[in-house]
């Protein structure tokens, strides 16, 4: 099987391999990773043909392009030996074609004279066509992979250009700076497009976002051909009554306007006000004979409860029958604001998975984001369900915390152990403070104090060790006041 070099973007490294595999699955082409390293933008894969390579790379967000691999080696002598042994029979078909040679270095560079010498070293290929820097018939590129602060490359690749991805065009088109309607919680456009790829969004599929906000995820899914709809507990966000988060922007902006901006209105079914625990969507009853799901996929970024405690629709206090009767038709009155109660973020994640199990078709995907503190055992808090297979976990790290994109596949009925689905039981927490229900929210506002206290203790240990060394060498022992001063200064610097 031919080998190809994928030129990756050196960003969101834990997402890159997952996205490539998802795109190959969508295109229906077998893909095998021959060489992949997170600290390098060069990846070697096996693909059946050039046409398969074009399909696999076409809508990638984290790959820049794909090249037919003509040779590789740790030195230029090894590279040329590899090119001769692998591609000699390929040269005649390009003998009269116009061509272009370029050189790219990762963490290193070459002067113009050095680049010219490297290009001349391939003269044994004896191409007779004219060199052309713009729109050549065939383009070749040398890739040099350097270690940091090292002048010689550690590895070199040589390849023939096959195709670019849509990365640059998509990022430019969906840039949030150019979007008419955004909010303070709108997710970066690159990540929404990436989530759509990993969730196997494809033309003709039906996708739903239960926390749509200003419509970032539905827009990304619609861009790749899906039919989309969404919901949110705050109807003002959907209708645009709260205004835009962009300074100086006036006028009426809403989710529909965003779809019109990208000419995607025909793919948008609409939106409604709801939370996932009280959804008006049909929840099919479990059936052993057939699967009754109707969604091809779910993409969402659930609220973490940081800016305000996580809430769902419902009263915090139990209502008497008389009170419930009097409130029954109040939602029809103008200006009605539905009551809300605090809710557990962990319980919400379980609700999302239970909803996915009930509504996804077999092999349907759900991709959702969730936060976690870096100093916790992350695997323990990843939710699970016997009817869902966790296919990938991708991490986006921040300063003191991180969030993960979890992707699940809806298992077919024959894949689910008998009785496993019925054994899933959930406990609902009511009437508690939002911080008690949401461990991540509490840690966020405490500034991850456990981490800070560990850092201060480490600084004190360093100071004590310094004092012991001075005593051993006959120096003056610093007093308690000096130790406190050093610790305070170190804290200030950190």
Where are these predicted regions, by residue range?
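Class I S-adenosyl-L-methionine-dependent methyltransferase catalytic core
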Residues: 1-54, 61, 107, 133-137, ...
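Generic detection of long, well-ordered alpha-helical segments
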Residues: 10-14, 73-80, 108-116
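Charged/polar, solvent-exposed surface patches and flexible loops
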Residues: 22, 81, 85, 117-125, ...
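Short, solvent-exposed coil/turn linker segments
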Residues: 30, 74-78, 82-90, 111, ...
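A short N-terminal interaction module
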Residues: 86-149, 156
């Amino acid at each position: 099987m031919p080998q190809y070099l994928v030129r990756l973007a050196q960003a969101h490294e834990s997402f890159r391999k997952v996205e490539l595999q998802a795109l190959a699955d969508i295109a229906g082409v077998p893909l095998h990773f021959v060489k992949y390293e997170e600290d390098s933008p060069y990846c070697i894969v096996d693909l059946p043909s050039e046409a398969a390579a074009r399909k696999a790379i076409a809508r990638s967000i984290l790959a820049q392009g794909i090249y037919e691999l003509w040779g590789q080696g740790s030195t230029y002598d090894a590279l040329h030996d590899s090119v001769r042994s692998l591609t000699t029979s390929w040269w005649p078909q390009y003998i009269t074609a116009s061509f272009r040679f370029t050189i790219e270095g990762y963490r290193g560079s070459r002067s113009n004279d050095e680049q010219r010498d490297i290009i001349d070293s391939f003269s044994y290929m004896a191409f007779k066509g004219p060199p052309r820097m713009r729109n050549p018939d065939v383009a070749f590129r040398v890739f040099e992979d350097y270690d940091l602060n090292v002048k010689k490359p550690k590895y070199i690749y040589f390849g023939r250009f096959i195709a670019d991805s849509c990365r640059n065009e998509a990022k430019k088109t969906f840039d949030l700076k150019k979007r008419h309607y955004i909010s303070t919680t709108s997710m970066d456009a690159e990540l929404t497009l990436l989530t759509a790829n990993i969730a196997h969004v494809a033309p003709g599929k039906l996708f739903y976002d239960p926390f749509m906000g200003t419509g970032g995820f539905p827009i990304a899914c619609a861009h790749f051909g899906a039919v989309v709809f969404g919901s949110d507990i705050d109807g003002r966000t959907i209708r645009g009554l709260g205004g835009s988060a962009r300074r100086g922007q006036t006028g009426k902006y809403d989710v529909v306007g965003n779809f019109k901006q990208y000419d995607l209105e025909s793919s948008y079914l609409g939106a409604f006000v709801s939370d996932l625990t009280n959804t008006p969507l049909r929840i099919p009853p479990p059936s052993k004979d057939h699967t009754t799901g109707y969604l091809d996929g779910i993409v969402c970024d659930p609220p973490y409860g940081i800016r305000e405690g996580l809430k769902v629709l419902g009263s915090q206090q139990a209502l008497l029958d008389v009170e419930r009767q009097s409130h029954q038709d109040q939602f029809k009155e103008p200006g009605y604001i539905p009551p809300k109660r605090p809710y557990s973020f962990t319980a919400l994640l379980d609700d999302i998975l239970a909803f996915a199990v009930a509504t996804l078709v077999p092999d349907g995907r759900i991709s959702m984001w969730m936060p976690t503190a870096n100093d916790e055992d992350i695997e323990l808090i990843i939710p699970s369900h016997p009817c869902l297979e966790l296919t990938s976990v991708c991490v986006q790290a921040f300063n003191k915390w991180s969030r993960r994109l979890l992707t699940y596949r809806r298992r077919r009925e024959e894949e689910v152990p008998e009785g496993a689905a019925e054994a899933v039981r959930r406990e609902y927490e009511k009437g508690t403070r939002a911080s008690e229900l949401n461990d991540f929210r509490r840690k966020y506002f405490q500034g991850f104090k456990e981490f800070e206290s560990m850092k201060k203790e480490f600084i004190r240990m360093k100071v004590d060790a310094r004092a012991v060394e001075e005593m051993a060498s006959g120096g003056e022992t610093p007093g308690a006041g000096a130790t406190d001063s050093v610790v305070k200064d170190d804290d200030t610097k950190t």
